[in-house]
Amino acid sequence: MTYEIDVEMEQKAADFYQSLGINQGPGDIQYRLILLVLNKNEGEVTEFADIREYTDRFADKGSIGSKMKTVFQLEGLVEKVKRGGYIITDKGIIAANFLKDTTDFYKKTKRMEDIIERMP
């Protein structure tokens, strides 16, 4: 599955969900980016370096590795297959598809806000 991850759009979507009080999952930019990178490499091993390529500007050193252990592995979203290598699980794919839906919802909401703003 090949697609580009729009980091700026994901940040805007995360900010939107945080404004609604949702700070985990859809409101967490690190979570969003990690899951989308893993999903992008579905069926292949995703290297830690692939994830860091997207998350470095949003994460402190060590926080991504910690999140991989405490959230992604613990919840069964990924399986660690080697040092620094992960494969997304079916549960992870479902979570990634949910995130894509949240991004689409954000875009539709933003578009509607823009239309309403222009109404006299």
Task: Show which residues each predicted segment covers.
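Short, locally clustered residues in the helix-turn-helix/winged-helix DNA-binding domain
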Residues: L35-G43, K100
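Short, amphipathic alpha-helical interaction segments positioned at domain boundaries
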Residues: I93-P120
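Intrinsically disordered, charged low-complexity linkers and terminal tails
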Residues: M1-E4, G21, K69-E75, I93-A96, ...
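Short acidic, hydrophobic short linear motifs in intrinsically disordered regions
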Residues: G43-T55
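Long, compositionally biased intrinsically disordered regions
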Residues: M1, N41-E42, M119
